């Protein structure tokens, strides 16, 4: 379907792992590899959740565990960077994977859509001296475009062929999101993660 390159990305858990960039016309994985371990992926906690399901959506509920979950992320990164800065000869594979975030060799890809979550992720970047960060999803990133530009944070938006998250939002918001961010000076890309990805790329 004309797709030349792809980022192969892990899923599941708070820190799914590392991704790599590959070309899709290749004989094997060694031939396909363009850049190995280009980034670490982090699923940022949601400050709220919506009850019910798609046919019968419920109300919006606050996540009472949001602050403890963010604290747990910070503690993990503290431990990882302390390990990387030590002379410990015993290898810890999960902590080893964090190498390169502060030097800029790897990008931290943060899955976040809410305004609060995105702000907290940017503050997390500054606190931990992480050089490169990309917000993945970024539905409400346009509300904090100035902050993203100031901190050199790029955004990978979700599918533009989507309905708004809330009933009273502009029905065209998913289409306009990229333009709003570009106007704010933010580097923007489109990604296609989710259900039925192969059909969506046709």
Located regions from the model:
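Flexible loop/turn segments at secondary-structure boundaries
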Residues: 13-16, 47-51, 116-118, 141-145, ...
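Polyanionic/metal-chelating signatures
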Residues: 2-132
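Short, mixed-charge, low-aromatic patches
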Residues: 76-79, 98-103, 134-138, 158-164, ...
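A contiguous, well-structured "functional interface" segment within a domain
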Residues: 119-122, 126-160
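A general structural motif
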Residues: 90-91, 110-114, 136-139, 166-174
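Generic beta-strand/beta-sheet core signal
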Residues: 8, 111-113, 136-138, 156-160, ...
